[in-house]
Amino acid sequence: MAASSISKRIALAAEIGLAHQDDLHVAMEEIADVIGCGLFAHESIPAAFGYIAAARGRVMDCLYMAINAGDDTDTVACMTGFITGAHCSSRDLSPRYLALIDEVNHFDLKEMACQIDAIAGNTPEA
């Protein structure tokens, strides 16, 4: 099956994001309109990178855009959150949201992160 180049679409999404860093709503709409935010990899992966570029990597801004863009928001928001979360750790996440996630899902994110770090052979940050 023929499909568009994901790497070229990532570059285009990042270009759109960088061009609209001063207006995240416009960035969100442009990325959704030009790139798309659907389930297919050639839309969802570039969209995630476009939101990250637009928001300058700020976790919550990236997530707000990914969630509010429409279409397959859970997929795009998960990728956006994974990428920015891995890059910045938890320092940019609201403690209120972390507590809510733990409470609603009945697990401990911090403990899970420590276990993943241990498996990877890393020393978790305090």
Predicted regions and their residues:
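Accessory "access/gating" subregions that flank catalytic or transport cores
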Residues: M1-G70, G121-P124
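Catalytic phosphate/nucleotide-handling subdomain of diverse soluble enzymes
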Residues: E43-E125
